[in-house]
Amino acid sequence: TAFNYDLRLNFDTSFTGKDLLRTRLRTGNFSSQPFGSSSSLFKLDKAESYANAVQLDRLYYSFPGLAKGVTLTAGALVRNTEMAWIPTAYKSDILDFFSVAGAPGVYNKATGAGFGAQWAQPGKKGFVANLNYVAQSGSDSTKGEFNAAGALNTLAQIGYRAPQYGIAFGYRNGTEGTRVRTFNGVAGNGGTLAANQTSNGYALNAYWQPKKSGIIPSVSAAYGWNYVSGPATPNAATNSQTWMAGVQWSDVFAKGNASGFAIGQPGNAPTLSKDALMWEAFYRYKVSDNISVTPAVFYVSNNQAFSGASSNYGGVIQTRFTF
């Protein structure tokens, strides 16, 4: 049993009422295993390994583009998934794999120096399109913003969303130093691409949710395919696929509460005799507008993070305060 915290302080400034300059400070005390490392299948969405040190976590500026519905973003510390649309109605905020809608090869939470453009068709429903670029080693003068060794991530997305449903196709290209999150049994340095390697990730996500809360839950599903190429690529770790399906009920027992269940397959190295399978279940109790308590349990089969393949259970009680 461990007691951990994650603290974020956002300093938001607007000059016109339509733009946003965000500076975020963050600290926490999660250890890398099992909850704090993006290489772990038990990685929690809200956990990072900061060892109690306060760090600058975000620094970016967003502003409207010239065309209607366009938002432009640039910054020294910006995340690719925050310049895109995560197409899912399943939002447990527990395991990292499900927080990126079962597509960690595309929505890999790459953070660094970058820029992006987002477009949403005006109205309650319509098309969306996003394109962004993040260099995770952009602050390193020996690599830079546009050097292939600088962990470059290019993410493109097109989709359609309406009040009750949505669907999107996403693509990400990664270079040396990038990685697919929550990968099981991958060859190489924890899944990080080596010199002369590139990755191409593809994802199709869709969801549907009822007009009103009741016994019928929202349904979310995803399929992802990832391909790694390059002269240094081990033959045993070129292709992988991921999928997930999740259901979530709203206003369970009381308004504002939620519960859900999700199951999925993380990326697995092709050499594994059995692929990993993971699931989670949660119930979120809304104490007030600013406080929630979420007990959750989860399970991973054939987890390669430990000595030999093993099946592991886990659980958390996540309390969140916002102000």
Listing of model-derived features with the role each one plays in the protein:
Residues 2-4, 49-56, 106-110, 147-151, ...:
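Transmembrane beta-barrel outer-membrane domains
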Residues 124-126, 149, 160-278:
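Detector for outer-membrane/organellar transmembrane beta-barrel domains
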Residues 275-313:
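Internal helix-turn-beta structural module
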